[in-house]
Amino acid sequence: GVLVGAGTVRADDPRLTVRMAPAGRNPVRRMVLDARAQLPVDCALFDDIAEAPLHIFTRHDADEGDIERLESAGAHVHPVPHDAGGLDLQRVLDVAWEAGIESILCEGGARLAEALLREGRIQRLYLLIAPTTLGTGGVSAFPQDAKAVEWSAFSPACAPQVFGRDTLIVLDKEGD
């Protein structure tokens, strides 16, 4: 599966699908964390919902009308517990597992990455480093307090790979 937060959907309007998959053979299970069930049904995620399932995780006390709106558009909505820190990520992962999603690629932003790192939910990191300056509108890939992350738990899985001017570094969590 591919996991993003609602902020990424609003900012980028992604499809989260395999671009060159044969018709009817899109294997990606798309997952969005949307605490308030406010995703617009006219976003790109709903364009090919019949071919690529969309799972939306929301607070268990989200508005029933909003949940029904998303379900009527074809999404699978999963209310989960939450606290001040956001949705219960362990419950999100449990529901994903129950739905047959055994591996998840997080393409979300810094908030989601921070939560997953803080809770020790990441086994492998793919860091793609590009020589591009983002400027003032750029979004950080890591939490503001990256020092709080236990980086020593990760080690290189293979030699860095170079793609043009970009470099890919793959890190595995030790012991996993």
Language model regions located:
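Enzymes that bind and transform nitrogen-containing heteroaromatic metabolites
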Residues: 1-176
